[in-house]
Amino acid sequence: MKSGIRVALVTGSNKGIGLAIVRDLCRLFSGEVVLTARDVARGQAAVQQLQAEGLSPRFHQLDIDDLQSIRTLRDFLLKEYGGLDVLVNNAGIAFKVADPTPFHIQAEVTMKTNFFGTRDVCTELLPLIKPQGRVVNISSMMSLRALKSCSPELQQKFRSETITEEELVGLMNKFAEDTKKGVHQKEGWPSSAYGVTKIGVTVLSRIHARKLSEQRKGDKILLNACCPGWVRTDMAGPSATKSPEEGAETPVYLALLPLDAEGPHGQFVMEKRVEQW
């Protein structure tokens, strides 16, 4: 085991914002950086691309939709490093606006990865986070937009300081069920499946931060959700306003908060500023 060596890991990091975050961490983080991807060939190609730039990330396979894949990664981190110092949950999916896939299937598929996949990674890897560790969950300003389009009842639930992870899971499942029945609008949901999944990520971040403050008070771990902005990626398309490098700025800022920092913690951050949830 490489005891004493710090390690940072970014999910879904073979391209786009994830790759830009890995590049910055390779330059700025004092420790090893693990690039992950579902597809081994694509992940290794991304590592080679960074090696050509004089950087040296490690690669490990990770499909956040596959619990066994997450657990294999967990075991690797424990064996190699005895834990994890920085976790950036970047992996996620979105359907294009013009995609003909029925809405309820879009909702189910997007929810499975963006919320449940991210939650599974947190379940397995948060216990590995070392004192003064940093966790960054990539959410989206779409979560704030979707929240404001929810019914007052749903808004109240999602803004609650006491909502539990189980209650949040119940709400995310209800959204998927309501879309299947075609009653999601009647039930107070917005019409963006992606937005609802990112409400889930933001609220999950608030819950996990609260738990860390309660259960690991002295460990000074900081966990936040953030929006990278509208970034030119395969997901957002070519007309977006930011480059991937610009999109990486806020996530990297949160991943590298000084070790003596008191916050932000449990916040939703955009352009390095805390946004009101």
Curated annotation (Swiss-Prot):
CDD domains with a match to the protein in the record: carb_red_PTCR-like_SDR_c
Matching PROSITE patterns: ADH_SHORT
Modified residues (Phosphoserine): 30
GO biological process per UniProt: lipid metabolic process; vitamin K metabolic process; xenobiotic metabolic process
Domain of life: Eukaryota
Record field: catalytic activity: a secondary alcohol + NADP(+) = a ketone + NADPH + H(+); prostaglandin F2alpha + NADP(+) = prostaglandin E2 + NADPH + H(+); prostaglandin E1 + NADP(+) = 15-oxoprostaglandin E1 + NADPH + H(+); prostaglandin D2 + NADP(+) = 15-oxoprostaglandin D2 + NADPH + H(+)
GO CC annotation: cytoplasm
GO MF entries: 15-hydroxyprostaglandin dehydrogenase (NAD+) activity; 15-hydroxyprostaglandin dehydrogenase (NADP+) activity; 15-hydroxyprostaglandin-D dehydrogenase (NADP+) activity; androstan-3-alpha,17-beta-diol dehydrogenase (NAD+) activity; carbonyl reductase (NADPH) activity; prostaglandin E2 9-reductase activity; S-nitrosoglutathione reductase (NADPH) activity
Catalytic site: 194 (proton acceptor)
InterPro entries xref list: CBR1-like, NAD(P)-bd_dom_sf, Sc_DH/Rdtase_CS, SDR_fam
Family: Belongs to the short-chain dehydrogenases/reductases (SDR) family.
Protein name: Carbonyl reductase [NADPH] 1
